[in-house]
Structures are given as C-alpha cells and as structure tokens.
UniProtKB/Swiss-Prot annotation:
One of its GO terms (cellular component) is DNA-directed RNA polymerase complex. Keywords: DNA-directed RNA polymerase, Nucleotidyltransferase, Transcription, Transferase. It catalyses: RNA(n) + a ribonucleoside 5'-triphosphate = RNA(n+1) + diphosphate. InterPro entries: DNA-dir_RNA_pol_omega, Pol_omega/Rpo6/RPB6, RPB6/omega-like_sf. This is DNA-directed RNA polymerase subunit omega.
C-alpha cells in the first residue's frame, strides 16, 4: 500500500479545503455510484483511492465537472429518445 500524504494531494488541488471537497466527491463516486478507480485498489478504502488519484493528477474538480456534464447529457439524450419512441408508438396506435 502506497502512503498518501495530504500535502502531496494539496499540491494538485491548490488548498486543503478544495482537496476535502474533491476527495469526498470522488470517494462517493467510487463507493456509492460504482465508478471504476483510476489506480490500483490495493484493498484501500474509497477515500484513500480518491486521494491517490488526486495525488497522481488523475482526478481534479474540473475533470469531475466535465464527467458529470457528459453523464447528464447522455441521461437527457436517452430520456428524449424514450419519449420520442413513446410518442411515435402513440401516433401509430400501438
């Protein structure tokens, strides 16, 4: 297990307050949303994995914002496609 220090991760984010927010957000993605870790898990908890990802420069607040925007757009597109399919079925009397 690689040792993770907050100081190393702070250098990537800018300050420790933003680090807490980014790490918590990423740990939640890993633990609750089932996102795949970008580093080896090595039996680490989601918070440690999140800190390791941040320390290695793989995760940032901007990256997660962009990722969430893409997922939101994909969700909206599939909802629109479902509504269009229902509307089309209704128009043809199915």
């Amino acid at each position: 297990m690689a040792r993770v220090t907050v100081e190393d991760a702070v250098k990537q984010v800018g300050n420790r307050f933003d680090l807490v927010l980014v790490a918590a957000r990423r740990a939640r993605q890993l633990a609750v949303q089932g996102k795949e870790p970008l580093v080896d898990e090595e039996n680490d908890k989601p918070t440690v994995i999140a800190l390791r990802e941040i320390e290695e420069g793989l995760i940032s607040n901007q990256f997660m914002d962009a990722q969430e925007r893409i997922e939101q757009q994909q969700q909206e597109a599939s909802e629109l496609a479902a509504v269009a399919a229902l509307t089309q079925d209704r128009d043809y009397g199915f």
